[in-house]
Amino acid sequence: GYDGVDKRIDVIATAIKGNLTVRDITNLELAYAPPYSSAKDPVNMAGYVASNILDGLVDVVYYNEIDKLISDGGLLIDVREPMEREMGFIEGSINIPLHEIRERLDEIPKDKELYVSCQVGLRGYLAARILKQHGYNVKNLDGGYKTYSDVYGAPEAAGCAYVDDAGEMHIADHNID
């Protein structure tokens, strides 16, 4: 695993053993050393994410639901930057970068089920909060495009190299418009 994963598993295991709630996890004081971690440890952040879901601040959908939701008429808004989207995207999504959401509200229909996604979930969460505050019924794709593409594989993207399941490298030539 990645550096520090074992320590975070220890913290979560201790929290479980101590009957802590996700709200308790947000308040844990974990040793902070700038060279090794951020001011809010990923364990704290996991607690915040779970608390936000429990408190109804954001509704989520999961990678295995999104394709059907789109095919049933839902609208998926990819809030990543265009350059990120060029590396791959979920079929049927449209791109409105997070920093443009407020200025482009008139382009977003209020009569559709809306879903937002980004790379891993943070910008999607922020977009979902903005849209919800403007009266939209919106859900964030939990784990974002990264989780979706980790499970289903990244589609071919213009000028992007990828490795298939057999370990063969290919250069994608699919045009993304």
What does each model-identified segment do?
Residues 1, 115-116:
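A generic structural signal for short
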Residues 1, 79-80:
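Fold-independent oxyanion-binding glycine-rich loops
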Residues 24-34, 38-64, 69-75, 82-113, ...:
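Rhodanese-like catalytic fold shared by cysteine-dependent sulfurtransferases
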Residues 1-25:
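C-terminal catalytic lobe of FAD-dependent flavoproteins
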